[in-house]
Amino acid sequence: MSTAGLLLAAGAGRRYGMPKALAQAPGGAELLVQRALRTLREGGCDPVVVVLGAGAEQAPPLPGAQVVVNEDWPTGMGSSLRAGLDALPEEVTAVVVLLVDTPGVTPQAVRRIAADARATTLRVATYSGDGGHPVLLGRDHWDGASRLAVGDVGARPYLVSQLVEEVPCDDIAIGTDLDTPPDLRDSDA
């Protein structure tokens, strides 16, 4: 039994002006895709699948990750979620899904979401009571999440149709996503 990480990093970042995966993370020492990969690895996820799309050819090497290029990335996050879930090995019991534009999510939040995960587990991190990332999908939920994942809403249609365990993460992470360069500049991550 293992818990994998799934990093969704395929979007063009239209509001951001470039693929967010290739943007500098707060602090400037690494790109957002590298920060998020490190967060999943340090959070105990193994293996980690990174789904790239827009700008994939410009991405740096991502040691410790299986990179999947989603050629359908213009259709939205749903196709990236499906591509990532399809790439996971059979022995994986659950997967922690993280978005590349949430650099305030910490390895501690990943560990909290992933604790004692089973194939039946379905969890979402909350910040001030609102759902965010990471999200944990036990293997029993992959088919349903894949079927309902359309456009840029990812697994949300599936999550709202299920009983989801909410896991408060306010004390160890910042769940805000970055949509524009000023968001990054103003980030506390």
Each model region followed by its residue ranges:
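Nucleotide and nucleotide-moiety/phosphate-recognizing core
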Residues: 2-131, 139, 163-169
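A residue-level structural signature of the nucleotidyltransferase/glycosyltransferase Rossmann-like core
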Residues: 102, 133-136, 147, 175-176
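Conserved alpha/beta core of the MobA/IspD/sugar-nucleotide pyrophosphorylase nucleotidyltransferase superfamily
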Residues: 1, 147-189
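A short acidic, helix-capping loop that chelates divalent metal ions and anchors anionic groups
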Residues: 15-18, 144-145, 175
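Conserved nucleotide-sugar donor-binding
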Residues: 132-144, 181
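Hydrophobic, well-ordered secondary-structure segments
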Residues: 86, 141, 145-146, 153
